[in-house]
């Protein structure tokens, strides 16, 4: 639900107490033209907590439990953590370079660089290293008495040269080796020891995570309070302050009581033309989960109705239809229950995690329900006469369609019987629906009517849901766009007429018993009437510019057809699941099980991606086009940030105003 926001002016003397009390109440966003940036101190707190999070992921909690020194300040802890982390990163870069150097000089073998330098100083004889490209049929030893073969590695031959030897430059390349591999390995061990010592110290400092987190909360609260005070304008040599702010209307009485307590004058003022009224949404349950989805795309404008609940239920439906498998839904539900049990402690203090797991469970239930109606379970094929399929929604609709065909004998029935003459003699709807085609060698190959009916029903359901979804959006936005009445009439009329134009039978005929010919005629004239009504209503609302509304017919038509993606993605997922099952069945049990497991894993990932992307897209693109302005900004009232550790100790449930 979107709550109304009004602009108020506050005038008074007691600035400090007023802002502190306003922060506790949390219903006012004070208006300022100043731009505030994140300070270096706040950034240091965040970086320190990131280091602690990395330690928590790398080590067990038992390894991070150490005795704390209560005399250490938070600032000293943060400084030491950041210094140690910086040093560790520098040492790791040195280790990386050292490993590369070890690989480079390893073929030269172990030697003492100091002894070589001493030998060169006393005798004047230099020792140098060379390498050349290795060739299988070439002798490794050189004829020169001062050239010694060392080793072959990385497809190169390595040599030691004493003194000055004239080697062919086109074949031999000198390699610099100021230090040997054994000396570098000693340096590497020393560096790793230093890294380990610093890492151990970081683990010791992890015990102060709660203090650092509390320090960040306190610092952030002080910064927010300071920024709110900076919004004020001082009057009468600083004796009086004045500040404007956006206020949640439902909390006006509480704010008025606060102002009376601190002798603050409060008056509603008009909104400036260039100001954008912030949007404040307040939801619970599924509405809050829908709000999380809405915030992914855009913040509703102040003039918009809250679409959270609508978006949530539509997303669950679209996601379930796209995944189109009860088995996958069962996995989603079980995963949600498993993670809910594993993170049950965190869920008490993290509303976001709790809502995400609940949404996963609801999506799993939706997939189970829709997969049951379409008899889809891990891509397995059920017999057309099985009880599981007989009571499914698609089977019931297909049977009603068969009854309509035999009773009314429409044009589509005649085309079907001309293609399969054996169907003419069948009078029982169930036998007609389950009629099979006789292939070569007298083998029944497929159900010619059943398969065709099921595909048509699923495709039409996607279009039907699209018409209903868009119509609901237009009805919600009717006060801002009168032409929506005309376009609703156009879509409903088109749904009546198109089956007649295509010579097929629709849900509205065999399920809602709409007369075939009469419905088509009404739909034909209703389409033109809907377009005309949309243009007339647009002209009433927008004067002569409403004539442009006529070109929206293409947009409306394409938006309805866009819902076919639900059918296409659901069909693709079902076909992939069935294909992996068939592939696995042809292989030995172990190999076939691996193929089926990997295949369904890939299909689940693709189904989730398709369900999330296209399930949200149909809401954010097609539906929002007729029921959403967007471009708003969320209300950010001055509120006190609650540290998760403090909330845990006091039993407070965290919301958006918390740092975990």
Curated annotation (Swiss-Prot):
Regions crossing the membrane = 312-332, 362-382, 453-473, 485-505, 520-540, 560-580, 593-613
A cellular component term, taken from the record's GO annotations: plasma membrane
Membrane topology designation? Multi-pass membrane protein
Keywords linked to the UniProt accession = Cell membrane, Hydrogen ion transport, Ion transport, Membrane, Transmembrane, Transmembrane helix, Transport
Where's it found, cell-wise? Cell membrane
Give GO terms for biological process: vacuolar acidification
Principal localization? membrane
Q: Which InterPro entries match?
A: V-ATPase_116kDa_su (IPR002490)
- Is-annotated flag, keyword Transmembrane helix? yes
**One GO MF term, please?**
ATPase binding
Family the entry assigns: Belongs to the V-ATPase 116 kDa subunit family.
* Role played: Produces ATP from ADP in the presence of a proton gradient across the membrane.
User: What is the protein name stated in its UniProt record?
Assistant: V-type ATP synthase subunit I
